Curated annotation (Swiss-Prot):
Organism: Caldanaerobacter subterraneus subsp. tengcongensis (strain DSM 15242 / JCM 11007 / NBRC 100824 / MB4)
Stated family: Belongs to the aspartate/glutamate racemases family.
InterPro entries registered for this protein in UniProt: Asp/Glu/hydantoin_racemase, Asp/Glu_race, Asp/Glu_racemase_AS_2, Glu_race
Residue sites binding substrate per the record: 10-11, 42-43, 74-75, 182-183
E.C. no: 5.1.1.3
Catalytic activity: L-glutamate = D-glutamate
Name of this chain's protein: Glutamate racemase 2
Length: 264
């Protein structure tokens, strides 16, 4: 047994969709969640900025004595060198690519993500490393994250943005669409309605949460015997984050702590 918490971080509220899946699979674990609400979105940031931000956040997580860190941000996964950190890191992008490979029947996979993730070609590279025959079609949807951060993921504006973005996949005959940004599952009902029944919409957090569980079991560092607790930290706006977190997780949150992340 190991009662140390699991760290989860994202540029904002998107990683809460990953946290929700983790809680479902590992309800007895404690969690430290960090949302970089001061510097969201990451999609248009430079490689150097994202590497700096990730280093600061991972240092913060180490100070919190976490036993593993879940990078719940595809843009970060697509940008940083994960090998340089001396802590167990879980990669939502890798889990998403693997899910897409195992879901597709016709070997035609779509990916929607931030501009930086698409430009990195990380999904395409990861998918083709498993099965080179799969055709990968990618589309950046930069309008999604600002809408979701404002809580407008069920709005008419969100529907219009999704319809415009997903138009790209018409005629491509994809049977699988990967939500390549952890914010996007909050728009999943809209995305599914637009894509129709013939396309399987993949949330990478489903596979990722089971990978974390398997690692904890294998390493014999599971926590058990009590209901887990969650501590929330942000770098900027705490009130909007608190509202969003309560909506996504379906539970009341007592406090969100603001941390000066740049000192790490």
């Amino acid at each position: 047994m190991d009662s140390r918490p699991i760290g989860v971080f994202d540029s904002g509220v998107g990683g809460l969709t990953v946290l929700k899946r983790l809680i479902q699979v590992l309800p007895e674990e404690d969690y430290i969640y960090f949302g970089d609400t001061k510097r969201v979105p990451y999609g248009d940031r430079s490689k150097e900025e994202i590497e700096l931000f990730a280093g600061q956040i991972i240092n913060f997580m180490k100070e919190k004595n976490v036993k593993a860190v879940v990078i719940a941000c595809n843009t970060t996964c697509a940008t940083i060198d994960k090998g340089k950190y001396d802590i167990e890191l879980f990669d939502v992008l890798k889990a998403g690519a693997e899910s897409g490979v195992y879901c597709t029947k016709n070997k035609k996979v779509g990916v929607i993500a931030t501009k930086r993730t698409v430009e990195s070609r990380s999904y395409e590279i990861n998918i083709k490393s498993i099965n080179p025959q799969i055709e990968v079609y990618q589309k950046a949807c930069p309008e999604f994250v600002p809408l979701i951060e404002k809580g407008l993921y069920n709005s008419h504006l969100a529907y219009k943005a999704a319809k415009d973005c997903l138009e790209e996949f018409k005629g491509k005959e994809i049977d699988t669409l990967i939500l390549g940004c952890t914010h996007y599952p909050l728009m999943e009902p809209i995305i599914k309605a637009i894509m129709g029944d013939g396309v399987k919409v993949v949330d990478p957090a489903v596979r990722l949460s089971h990978e974390v569980k398997e690692y904890l079991e294998r390493s014999r560092i599971l926590n058990f015997g009590k209901k887990g607790k969650i501590e929330f930290f942000v770098s900027g706006d705490a009130e909007n984050f608190k509202r969003a977190a309560e909506m996504v997780l379906g539970k009341k949150i007592d406090e969100v702590f603001i941390v000066d992340i740049e000192r790490y």
